[in-house]
Amino acid sequence: MELKKIYTGLNAQEVAENRKKYGENLLTPPAQIPLWKRFITKFKDPLIIILLVAGVLSIAISFYEYHGLHEGTEVFFEPVGIFIAILLAIGMAFFFEEKANRAFAILNQVDDDEPVEVIRDGNPKKIAKRDIVVDDIVLLNTGAEAPADGKLLEAISLHIDESTLTGEPICHKSTHEEDFDKDATFPSDYVLRGTKVMEGHGVFRVEKVGDNTENGKVFVASQIDNSVKTPLTEQLERLGNLITWSSYTIAVIILIARIAMFFLSYDFTWVHFLQYLLDSIMICVTLIVVAVPEGLPMAVTLSLAYSMRRMLKTNNLVRKMHACETMGATTVICTDKTGTLTQNQMRVYKIEVDCSSEEHKALAKEGIAVNSTASLDLSDAQHPTVLGNPTEGALLLWLHEKGYDYRQLRADVEIIDELPFSTERKCMGTLVRSGLLPGKTILYIKGATDIIRYYCSDIMGDRSWDDITAQLLKWQNQAMRTLGFACMIIPDSSEFKLHEGVISQILDSIKDGNNGLTFQGIVAIADPVRKEVPDAVRECLDAGIDVKIVTGDTPGTAKEIGRQVGIWTEKDCDRCVITGSEFEALSDKELSERVNSLKIIARARPMDKKRLVEALQAKHHVVAVTGDGTNDAPALKAAHVGLSMGDGTSVAKEASDITIIDNSFSSIGRAVMWGRSLYQNIQRFILFQMTVNVAACLIVLAGALLGTQSPLTVTQMLWVNLIMDTFAAMALASLPPSEAVMQNKPRDRKAFIINPSMSRQIIGVGGLFFILLLGLLYMLEYAPINSMTDLLTWHSTGPRELTNHELSIFFTVFVMLQFWNMFNARAFATGKSTFHFKDCKGFGIIVLVIFIGQIIIVQFGGKMFNVTPLCLTDWIAIIVVTSLVLWVGELLRLINRK
């Protein structure tokens, strides 16, 4: 690099002093939580805490029964089952989250040993990026990455890609105040750590290093844990509190009622009373244990784990398990523009260059190929990538798509002179001996159309300047970049000597278009919207989710992109868009008043999106944020769900909860659908298990008040718990997502997970089960029943002990009621028949396992399960009678559909 000035830079002593005073050029890595702490954190789940309490109480009961009542070791099955349920739920959640974390590369690793060219002691030298200190003089060349923040001392045709910090891919940098872009996010004479030089070169003095750089501030902010509670966590806490206080209330009622019954029925003696009181307390503790849905944590974990695995197939790599469900509660998505809504690759929108003759066609394609500093990486011919200026690269991509090899076109010419682009001249030129028109020397120029027009004396084709101006205005109103092309065939008799510097002489000789070039045409270049984005945005809007754009681009460009994807409409006013500087100037109160109506923040600074997220959260929105740049990291971390793009920066991925592998906005709609369906699956499990729990609690309550013992043995209850917990969780968690959920508005995050419809079903069906089971128990106790058909001719013969056959009938009826009710739970909130089995293979297999398992236990369980085999008639009668639960449910669903 040729320097305009002589710089001495720092000496060794100054380097040491500045390093001590301002710190090293290193980003503080995020604190890593030890593995054991991450595991222990799982025990903070409210339902897990309730289960732990229930497990301890269950152990106390078991020890009392084993040592005090001299019962067998089977009394320990219940507490063992509870702790197994706890370990399964925690273990699965921990395993899947750790597996997802390992699926991420080391995302926030920064190469601090990358060499950087600086001037020290008056000499250029290369040092490691980590060794840069404040006041170092750094040399920037094309392709280099700025190692720190600083102020430019020199800038020659310097263009920098700031997309990782502002979302803006190309920013012109200058040291001349008249060339400054007043609307730019950062000053035009300032460079930022992590940004890349796309064109030109420059020199800057370092002002900030490490965590003090803009990149560093974003990196540090992205590590802040805001401890935002997910909607599901809030709901499970409420459910846990409801179960806890309900069971405690019923337990107190039982204790008071039994004490009252004691004084009404027995003569008081302290020994007798204490024994009775201890028995009553054991019954109360049993009820509390029965009331706890120990399968719920496992059901939630299974649902989340299943969704994580299936969402990966739809290009959503979920890192944090609860993010699956939180997507379903999302009310607002804040997205950046570049790379998320658009392709982040400049492409030719339309080109209008005269090709009416073979010569004109040759001039057009040769001019595009040779008058360019960009090139293409064609290692993947189907997906070429641009190297160099994105705008020039777009023209080469257009040539490539038309089947022309720009490399061959360049190889066939002899370049005589080149005029690089400059902000002063606003055009560039190349003088060549043509390969397509042998023997001719041609000057090609391109640049701002008004500048190119100045140098032209005529136009190719039959278009007028008015036509061209009208077309340019139309494109510019669509926020597109426009360029003009012109050429001149230099005659052999030309007065100019063909050597380096001749292009400037030719252009300077042209006065007001006299003896000028021939205008070839114009081109519109834009970063096109991804094809799938408009439909994806429409899907989100139809689902009641607002989408807001936060970008470093201009308001005009942002509004045009918003219009193309369906976010910005004709009804929207200026109040719906704001610039970063205006946004920063808003007070918290003013922001609170405007935040719901804002649709676009243009020229946004790195921390603007984070402030927007926090303002939306203060308005009780559930916020998801998409982003691919380092500038997005704080907002990704602060949001309820952070969605990074697969080709985003490592800092963005580290801060996110979900990575969209294919960078497609449409994958976000799939994630919302999975989240909403997952929440419904959890509701279905709660509906199923709470119905069983209500029936079980009422049976314990009735038994306590009537003085009867439970007709179900410990081993039978273990099988019932296995059905209620593991099998039901697996069956209902594996239900596929429903497209229908995308027609609904987002649920109110404050609305209880047990909605009124569920409450009615839980109390109604649970109460009905209790009445049926209590009635059956009464009939079995007051008359000998050798077959189910005996119930048709039943008459009371007085109370007696139940036989094993009668206990087997009661046990099977109890299980089959739950079996059929599982079908009702599956159909909840679908609006369809329970026999709609599409994509429900897992559910079908599990209910078949339950049914076959019940038959095997009853027919072959013997003493272990305290059962005797039932005849075929009994089985048919039990199946038919208990299936009424399903048929009544189907009838009610049919009525509701009509």
Where are these regions (language model features)?
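Core segments of transmembrane alpha-helices
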Residues: V692-A696, G764-L773
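Conserved cytosolic headpiece of P-type ATPases
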Residues: M1-P746, A751-I754, F811, F828-K898
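Membrane-helix interface motif
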Residues: I259-D267, L774-L791, Q859-G862
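Helix-coil boundary and interhelical linker segments in multi-pass alpha-helical membrane proteins
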Residues: A704-T713, M779-H805
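Membrane-water interface at loop-to-transmembrane-helix junctions
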Residues: D748-L768, T797-I809, F837
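Generic alpha-helical transmembrane segments
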Residues: M724, H805-M822, V847
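Alpha-helix capping/termination and helix-coil
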Residues: H620, V672, R676, I771-A783, ...
